[in-house]
Amino acid sequence: MMLKTAVRLSLLACCSAVLAAPATAQTPTPAPAPAPAQSAAAAKGTPPPPPPLLQIEREEVRPGKGAAHTANEAAWAAAYAKAQSPVQWLGMTTVSGPNEAWFLTRHESFAALEKSDASTDANPALSAERDRVAAVDGDLLTRSSTILARYRPGLSYQPAVNLPSMRYMTVNIMRVKAGHVEDFLEGWRMVVEAHKKATMDEHWAVYEVESGMPDTTFLFLYARKSLAEIDASGPMHVAAGYRDAMGESGRRNMNEASRSGIEMTQTMHFRLRPGMSNLGKEWAETDAFWAPPAAVPVKTAQKK
């Protein structure tokens, strides 16, 4: 029970930077584009801060349709590449639980999001291909939804990470009870300060949902190079350094705030999927993991 509690605390106390995009809706061409998933400078060692606005396309895939869905997502990327659209997104699929695919894209504001959508609609060829691929998606999914969430820097800790080097993303969904939001915010600011004091080797970004999920829902996002990081996360939060930084009263107050103020939590682990993403060439230049798969040569029958 103690280990389970420690692991859960670690999941509630860490998460990391985001970027990327949706497999539907979003799409600019001539008008102001959303900020790129990660700039070349960022990929080379200066990670950008999390975007002010995050858009998430959440898709639930029908049983047995995973391979077909993966192939159709590649068609999305091909359509945007052909149209030379600046829209970029990061695709990822669940490691456990229901078969879901999430597509994340960054925006500077709601105005930028609106211009992005308008510019895609103004491109007839891209719009037509988008509608065609979306129709195929409809036969592969049981449900899809769009989530818009705003970045909360005061609740985040060392959020800028070198995303091209990451392979997994954990999302912890927390819904706060009405009337308890201020206590929740105060508690998490205390967690951030304790992490700073203990110089914890963690990174997370927090987003508050604006639409697409119930109000007072917060998303804690953290990127991982390996799932093995989860093994170290639990013990790290019960070690003396962090316990001293939180203090006995801090731990007691945080536990009480969680019991009385949190309506629900859900933790989801995702694997990042290059083939379902549409990212800048700097990603592949930084890490070959993101390079498009080489075309398989077609063998022709030899003449007899």
Enumerate the language-model features and the residues they cover:
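Short S/T/G/P-rich N-terminal loop/turn motif that feeds into the first structured element of a domain
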Residues: 25-304
